[in-house]
Amino acid sequence: LAFTRSLTLHLSELPRGKVLGIVNFPTFRQAMAAAQHIVKLGPTAVELVDRIMIELALANPAFKPTIETALIGKPAAILLVEFAGADAAALQGKLRDLQALMGDLGLPGSVVPMPDEAPQKNLWEVRKAGLNIMMSLKGDGKPVSFIEDCAVPLEHLADYTDALTEV
């Protein structure tokens, strides 16, 4: 509880544009290790889609066309990297920076640029539907939301997720 006599609220203008770079990784660990470098580019969001989720989306006729637009080959994981801002040219530059970074990290040609709003929205919807897609697994075993988010320094994220996977 608090008593407030005065409050100053600083509002920011909503970004006018967004671009999405989908980074495809051959291993889950590489995706986790790359996060510490990707955040230095200043994205507004970085979200993981792992192999299980990718396979389930591909098996679902409603999601298959959308997820296919994001894939290069058969990745073990993808990161959805979103940049937002008012300057369209600057946003395109951010996508180029992401592509260059991935080349520097040994993964040239791993980024699917998605500059248009409609495909971005569709892909975010697939990501958002993740738990429902996971619940569509056949059989008695169903996924349990064990750890949603964690606070781990990014330089330790790959080791952390490796250790967690062993559990």
Language model regions located:
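Noncatalytic alpha-helical scaffold of FAD-dependent oxidoreductases
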Residues: 1-167
